[in-house]
Each structure stands twice: as C-alpha cells, then as structure tokens.
C-alpha cells in the first residue's frame, strides 16, 4: 500500500524538489511483500529513512509545510507529507447487528465487504456505499495528503499562539500500528477535528452529498436508458429525434461553405451517438467508403462523435493538406471519445506539439533505420522458432490471422523489454484478450465516448480498471528488470527514466508501450496475414519469390542481411502490393492542418480534422493503371519512393509517419523469407481468387483475413 502511495507522490516530484523520502518509522520487516515494495520505491529513486519518527513540527505562518524529526535529531523539512492511516469502520456495532460482513486488512484497515459493483452485502437488502465499502478510503487519503494537510498543521500552530507546538506521532495516528479500541479512534478523530475547522468539514460533507446526488442521478439515467433500448420502436424514434436536432446544430457550429456558391460541403448527416465513427469508419469502413464516395463525390464530411472529419480521396487534395504535415496535430483521443483517451490518449501516436517531440525524442533511437538491422538476429530467431512450433503448418491447413497472431507480438516485446522470460510472455498472452475486449468497447462508442460514463458500473469500465492494473504492474516489474540487467537501451528503461527525470508523464510511458505492443499487434498482424493469402492465390508470384529468396540465400547465407534491408527487391515489392490492395484500415487516423485549406472551392478552417480514404488512394485511383485491382508486385520494381508519395497510404505522410515502420518491414520480410523458402502455400478448392471477395474479420478494426490456406513443406528446411 505504501509503495503504491509512493508511486502516486512521484507525480509531484520536480527537478527543484529533489527525490521524495519514504519514512518507515523503524526497521523494515524482512519479507517478500516488503522487498517487492522496496523494489518499487528504489525504482523511483526515492530516499528511504528507517529511523523512528519522534515528532512532526509544523511550519509557522506564512510558511507552510512540516519538519519530520527522527531518532538522533535528524530533520527533514517537507512541503508535502502523505500517510495512509489504519482505519476502522464507524458504526461497527450497528453493522455487526445487521449481520453484514466486515473485512480487515492489516495495513488498510476495515471495510464492509461488498459482492458486486452496486454495493450489495452478504445480507439481502443491505447495501453499502462510499468509504465504508472500500479499503482505499478517499476521505482518509484526502486528510492524510495534500497541500491542505500542510496548511492544517500551520492552522493548528496558529491556534496555539503561533508557537508551532510539536504534535507527537501518537497524536496524529500516523504510525502503522492499528487502532484497536474506540478510545484510540476517538483520540485520532479529535486530532482530525483540531486540524480541520468545522466549516471545512461541513464544506466537505456538502461536496460529498452533491457528488452522491450526481452519481445517483447518473445511475438512474443509465438504468432508464438501458430500459428504453429494449423498446426498439421507442429507441428508434428517440435516436432519430436526437440525430436531427444535433445535426441541425453541428452543421451550423462547424460550417464548411463553397467560396463561390455558398453551399455546404456534402457529407453524411450526424447519427446519434457515434456519428459515423468508429464503427462506421473502421469495422464497416470498406463497405461504407464506397457508398459514401458514390453519394457525395471526391470530398465530403463525416462525423466522429460530434467532431467533423473531412475525407480526402485524391493525391491532389492530400498534397494540399499535408504540405506542412510537420505542423499538423492529431485529433484529441483520435476523435473516439473518453475511453480511447484512457487507453491511448497520451501515447506517442495521438499527442501533438511539444509533448509529441519530447516522447519521440525518448523513443526514436530504438527504431531508426540504422538500429532496426541490429534486431535481425532476434527476429530470425523468433520467427524460426515460432514457425517450427506452429501446429497449423504441421497439419497442413493455415489461418494466417489466427495462427501467426502472436509472432509480431513476441518480436516487438523482445525489442521493448529485452529478451523476455517465459513468465513475461505468458503474462502478455493472458492480457491480450482483455486488451482486445477493452478496445472493442472503444470502437463501439456509445456511452464510452462520454466522460461521465466513468461513473457507471459498465463492463467497459471494469475491463479498463483490470487491464490498467495489470499493465502498470507488468511494466513496473519490466523496468526494474531492465535496470538490474543494465539494459539501458531498451524503450521500457528509457521511457521510465524520462518519467523520473520529468521529461514525460507516466501516462505517456504506459500508453506508448501499449501502442507499440497491443495497438500495433493488430496493425502488424494485418500486414503479415494478408501476404500469405496473396501468395497462395498467385502461385506464379510465389514461385518467383521463392527463386528470388533462394538466390539471395546462396549469395549471402541464411541471414541475408543485405537482401532484407533492400527496398528494391521482389520481396519488398510483394509486401508493398499486398499493403496497397489491403490497407490496414479503410480510413487513416484523423489529424488537423494548422491553417485553412481550399479544396474544390470549399473553405475548410484550420484545426479541422482530415482522414484519408485508403482504398480510394491505394486501389481506385487511375495512377495504378487498368489492372489496379490485380495483384502484380512487379509494378513496384524500379519505382522510387518519391514517385509514390501522396499516391499510397501506408505509414502516413511526412515527419509523423509510423515510428516503427523500419522494424515492421523487417519483421514482414524475415517472416516471408522463412515461410516461402520452407512451405508452398495454396488455396483450398472452391476458394474465390478475386481479392475483393475475400472474407475478413468483421469484429477487427484492422483488416484481417478469415481464409484457410493449404501449406506443404518444400522439403528439408533451410
């Protein structure tokens, strides 16, 4: 508990304040739990004082703070002092008579045991709410920490003539020995009243009462809405009414007019509560984009929640918008609302300006073009081991998205944390389904878009709390491991060192690691899983690639470092062609230009978010010729990267391209080399050859195939 409190206090540490100090009030017990807690404290670079605390001396007005005096006369002058006291349940006798069960924790204190999020107890009809129902007491923590705590000491000194009377440790109940009698509890309560005047306490009670009414009203509204949703006719009528009213308001709140005709930009009407995002953009985006383009032309507007997004489909428009992409800002929370903000809102890919530059400065060294090749042996080892153990390859039938799901996951994990232990791999595999379920709530939108939804007992909030708790614990342990091993080049070490130095926030670190591992699991898997499908559907291309790989292997050996770094090879062309025909998603993530743009006569204000229709650009545009729908990797041979600029969306445009693009390409190339030189891929009988008709996972926000392939060993493995 105290280690957790120390982590919270770490957010207040600044370069001028110096490291925080943890007072143990005596010798530290020698047990595993305490060793783990000290490991966390040590990782934060905190000082630890093991001397017995003798007294606390409050500052004299107008100064604030408190001086902690320990055995031997050593003094610590602090501006902020926090403590979590042992607490007992007030009205315990009444609760016991009711038969409600009271739990006791040797550190946290007592609380009434609840059996569900609604506060039910073991006694039917008896409910409990507030601090009585949780080990983590909000009021006790508020009293025990913060600026008001220090000011209250000053107030106590003034009440005693301004002499700064010393208050002993026993008087303020700051030690960890439990209060076992009512007399001791009353004594502590008396001291608290001394520290907080009655007006402050009354104000606190009023604020709590108001909050309770707000929460109660929110729960009632939520319950009422859930009931309304069961009545389909009424639900549809309410949705239509809300949609029409909000569409009328939003189109006037965010006008986009033609400079000559004055007409509004064409586009979709707002549909409550999500508009057209995220489900409309991602889950159903492939079907929707064709219909929307047909109805509205080559430039139009959609709504992500209540935020407008302008859809770009042509290289000319993209060039006009992205000419100053270094000054663009990403949409707040990706235009996906509150829950997205809690999961990835502070990650590298979704922040802008100075925050983005600081986080990128910490991360980029591990993902540069020159650094990526250093991971070649690691990637070869992971890929070879994974494919050798893949039961799908052994049985002769393969579903690429399912059977190769964790391959890029494990490679990236080794890069982020250093070579992972089996325990680390197991924990990440166990967290992956929870993270996937959490992101499904993000994509579905609805209540999860709104900040007030955090107060509701929803499954999304439960999943968020569970994932966040496990993710923080995993990364804290991984950081300690990296520090102990001297793995200072790993991103986990660099990120949390930057947090300690005050360069970035803890949220930046946790969410950027999440983005690199879990968010990019879907992204990398999307690119990795479509390549085998295209090769299986095109045997001639597959055989040409096999011959190309064999020749490179004979020239360089099995590792083929030069071949794998070369972006002009047939292997690289196959990957590009697959990415062209099957973009990761129908639309790019939203970002805004800093100044106004005029597109086809429509004046679009600075700060308006744009998204790119990837299929319109990658597949439908005439740049790709009459065979634009066919898989022909040769179209990329001899073509320079500059010639493709603004004609193909893959890693983005300009300085804000995907940080991990070099590592991602290397993973894809090594994977295809191992796969093609050892197995021959094919389609099952009756499988459709036209890629436009191939089935995909309709529940995945990134395009993943749901296609069974046949795989036959080519002979002795290389």
Swiss-Prot record:
Chain intervals for the UniProt region annotation (Cytochrome P450 monooxygenase ataC): 216-718
Known cofactor(s): FAD; heme
Loss of function: phenotype: Impairs the production of acetylaranotin and accumulates the intermediate cyclo-L-Phe-L-Phe.
Assigned keywords, A-Z: FAD, Flavoprotein, Glycoprotein, Iron, Metal-binding, Monooxygenase, Multifunctional enzyme, NADP, Oxidoreductase, Signal
Domain of life from the UniProt record: Eukaryota
InterPro entries named in the record: Cyt_P450, Cyt_P450_CS, Cyt_P450_E_grp-I, Cyt_P450_sf, FAD/NAD-bd_sf
Sequence positions that bind FAD: 72-90, 109-114, 515-516
One Gene Ontology term of the molecular function aspect: heme binding
Region feature Thioredoxin reductase ataT, mapped onto this chain: 1-215
Positions that bind heme: 658
Signal peptide: 1-20
CDD domains in the record: CYP_GliC-like
Pathway annotation from the record: Mycotoxin biosynthesis
Cell inner membrane is among the record's keywords: no
Documented EC number(s): 1.8.1.-, 1.-.-.-
Record family assignment: In the N-terminal section; belongs to the class-II pyridine nucleotide-disulfide oxidoreductase family. In the C-terminal section; belongs to the cytochrome P450 family.
PANTHER family: CYTOCHROME P450 307A1-RELATED, HEME-BINDING MONOOXYGENASE FAMILY
Record function comment: Bimodular acetylaranotin synthesis protein; part of the gene cluster that mediates the biosynthesis of acetylaranotin, a member of the epipolythiodioxopiperazine (ETP) class of toxins characterized by a disulfide-bridged cyclic dipeptide. The first step of acetylaranotin biosynthesis is performed by the NRPS ataP which produces diketopiperazine cyclo-L-Phe-L-Phe via the condensation of 2 phenylalanines (L-Phe). The ataC domain of ataTC then catalyzes the formation of bishydroxylation of cyclo-L-Phe-L-Phe.
Protein name: Bimodular acetylaranotin synthesis protein ataTC
Organism name: Aspergillus terreus (strain NIH 2624 / FGSC A1156)
């Amino acid at each position: 508990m105290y280690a957790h409190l120390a982590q919270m206090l770490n957010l207040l540490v600044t370069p001028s304040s110096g490291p925080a100090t943890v007072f143990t009030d005596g010798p530290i017990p020698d047990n595993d739990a305490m060793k783990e807690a000290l490991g966390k404290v040590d990782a934060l670079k905190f000082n630890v004082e093991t001397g017995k605390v003798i007294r606390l001396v409050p500052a004299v007005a107008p100064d604030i703070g408190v001086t902690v005096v320990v055995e031997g006369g050593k003094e610590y002058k602090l501006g902020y002092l926090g403590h979590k006291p042992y607490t007992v349940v007030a009205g315990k006798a009444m609760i016991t008579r009711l038969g409600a069960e009271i739990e006791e924790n040797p550190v946290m204190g007592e609380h009434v045991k609840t059996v569900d999020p609604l506060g039910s107890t073991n006694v039917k009809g008896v409910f409990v709410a507030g601090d009585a129902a949780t080990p983590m007491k909000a009021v006790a923590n508020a009293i025990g920490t913060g600026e008001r705590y220090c000011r209250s000491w000053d107030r106590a000194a003034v009440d005693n003539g301004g002499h700064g009377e010393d208050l002993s440790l026993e008087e303020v109940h700051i030690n960890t020995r439990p209060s076992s009698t009512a007399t001791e509890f009353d004594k502590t309560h008396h001291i608290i009243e001394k520290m907080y005047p009655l007006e402050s306490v009354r104000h606190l009670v009023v604020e709590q009462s108001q909050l309770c009414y707000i929460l109660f009203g929110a729960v009632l509204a939520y319950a009422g809405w859930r009931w309304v949703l069961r009545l389909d006719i009424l639900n549809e009528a309410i949705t239509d009414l809300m949609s029409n009213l909000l569409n009328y308001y939003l189109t006037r709140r965010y006008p986009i007019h033609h400079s000559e005709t004055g007409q509004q930009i064409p586009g979709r009407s707002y549909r409550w509560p999500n508009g057209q995002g995220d489900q409309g953009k991602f889950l159903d985006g492939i079907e929707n984009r064709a219909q929307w383009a047909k109805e509205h032309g080559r430039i139009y507007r959609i709504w992500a929640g209540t935020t407008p997004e302008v859809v770009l489909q042509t290289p000319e428009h993209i060039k006009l918008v992205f000419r100053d992409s270094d000054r663009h800002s990403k949409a707040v929370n990706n235009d996906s609302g509150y829950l997205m903000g809690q999961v990835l809102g502070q990650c590298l890919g979704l922040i802008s300006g100075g925050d983005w530059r600081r986080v990128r400065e910490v991360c980029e060294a591990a993902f540069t073009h020159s650094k990526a090749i250093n991971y070649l042996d690691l990637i070869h080892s992971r890929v070879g081991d994974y494919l050798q153990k893949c039961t799908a390859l052994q049985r002769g039938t393969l579903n690429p998205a399912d059977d190769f799901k964790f391959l890029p996951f494990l490679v990236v994990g080794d890069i982020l944390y250093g070579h992972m232990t089996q325990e680390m791999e197991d924990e990440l595999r166990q967290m992956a389904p929870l993270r996937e379920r959490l992101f499904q709530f993000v994509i579905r939108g609805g209540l999860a878009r709104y900040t007030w939804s955090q107060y509701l007992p929803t499954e999304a909030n439960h999943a968020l709390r569970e994932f966040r708790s496990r993710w923080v614990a995993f990364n804290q342990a991984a950081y300690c491991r990296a520090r102990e091993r001297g793995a200072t080049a790993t991103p986990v070490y660099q990120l949390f060192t930057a947090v300690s130095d005050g360069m970035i926030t803890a949220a930046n670190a946790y969410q950027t690691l999440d983005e690199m591992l879990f968010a990019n699991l879907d992204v990398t898997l999307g690119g990795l899983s479509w390549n085998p499908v295209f090769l299986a559907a095109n045997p001639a291309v597959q055989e040409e690639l096999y011959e190309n790989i064999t020749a490179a292997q004979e020239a360089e050996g099995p590792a083929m470092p030069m071949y794998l770094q070369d972006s002009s090879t047939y292997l690289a062309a196959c990957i590009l062609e697959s990415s062209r025909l099957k973009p990761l998603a129908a639309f790019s993530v939203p970002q805004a230009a800093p100044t106004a743009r005029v597109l086809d006569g429509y004046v679009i204000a600075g700060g308006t978010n744009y998204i790119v229709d990837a299929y319109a650009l990658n597949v439908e545009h005439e740049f790709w010729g009459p065979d634009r729908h066919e898989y022909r990797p040769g179209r990329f041979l001899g073509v320079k990267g500059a010639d493709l600029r603004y004609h193909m969306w893959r890693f983005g445009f300009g300085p804000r391209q995907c940080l991990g693009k070099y590592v991602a390409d290397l993973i894809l190339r090594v994977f295809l080399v191992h796969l093609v030189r050892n197995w021959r891929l094919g389609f099952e009988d009756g499988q459709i050859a036209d890629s436009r008709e191939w089935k995909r996972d309709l529940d995945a926000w990134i395009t993943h195939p749901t296609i069974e392939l046949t795989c036959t060993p080519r002979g002795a493995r290389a």
